[in-house]
Amino acid sequence: MDRNILLGLLLALACLFVVMDARANEIEQRNAIAADVRALVESRDFAALDALAVRYRNPAERTGSGVWKLESYYTGLADVITSRRPSDAFRKKQAAFVDDWITARPNSASARLAAAMLLENHAWNIRGRGYARTVREQDWAPFRDYIERSRMYLEQHKSIADVDPHWYASMQRIANSQGWPAERFQQLFEEGTGKYPGYYALYFTATVYLLPKWNGSAQSIDDFARRAMRGTAADEGAGMYTRIYWVAIDSQFRDGFPENSKVDWALMKKGIDDVMAKYPDDWNIQNFAYFSCLAGDKMKAASLFARMGEQPDMEVWDSMERFKQCHSWATQTRLKSAAQ
């Protein structure tokens, strides 16, 4: 085949893959990253696991919604090496895998984070994921012991592992599990965001720490969202305010939004616009339309539905009935306004 023709075909194929990737929805992108991680774990390709993590530490490596791909890397890793109901054989196998990873690549940040992840997951398997009142008294001591082991491991290997911003997200989860006082948690958060100011997971795990059901209140969420917005305004505008409330809605407020929160909806709308200016992804559009419905903002919901793709994403809406209610409510208003 003529060399120029071959190059043309290869270029066209590359463009096709770019288009296909752009059209893939958010969950498909995240699942694809997780699948890559799973394949590398199963093939025991330690070098490739590290190379992928290094690649995803680049702030430019994001999904269509703007979320760092590094977060999906660690979610995928957790899905492979941990389980909520692991057998003894599974635990031993995965511990051996992580040990082998560390032996083969002792300076791997991701391998060290994986080891801490195993300890943390075992703690939660002992405790259970329910409310504190459902935990058996005899399970508290071993839960706290394994959480402390995870904290100590992270501290011991900080010089290796904190080249990865997820070290700080991991430590913030531990801080939440141990109920650190606000001052101590704030010091950790400021250290992490001082090194990695754009890593969303640091803001998201801090949001969970500040939820009313954990260590904070609705007011502490709003105060934090405003501080975070000011610190990231040069890159995000008001987008961080909106993203923090996104986590708060998913983690606690949900159908009690906005009544149970202290949100400034006008500011959150500005944040929606700022996120959409950089990441006009259908995942963002549908979530923001849903939040607009919860907030009772018909005009904002209608404008977002006008930009939405053809299919509702059930990861956003939970049910087709919920989507139809919101869509009908917003669209009918828009049609009436257009007719006047």
Map each language-model feature to its residues.
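N-terminal mature-domain "stem" immediately C-terminal to a signal peptide or N-terminal signal-anchor/transmembrane
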Residues: N25-S65
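Sec/Tat signal peptide C-region and signal peptidase I cleavage site
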Residues: M20-A24
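Intrinsically disordered, low-complexity segments enriched in Gly and acidic/Ser/Thr residues
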Residues: S251-K300
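Bacterial N-terminal signal peptides that target proteins for export
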Residues: M1-L9
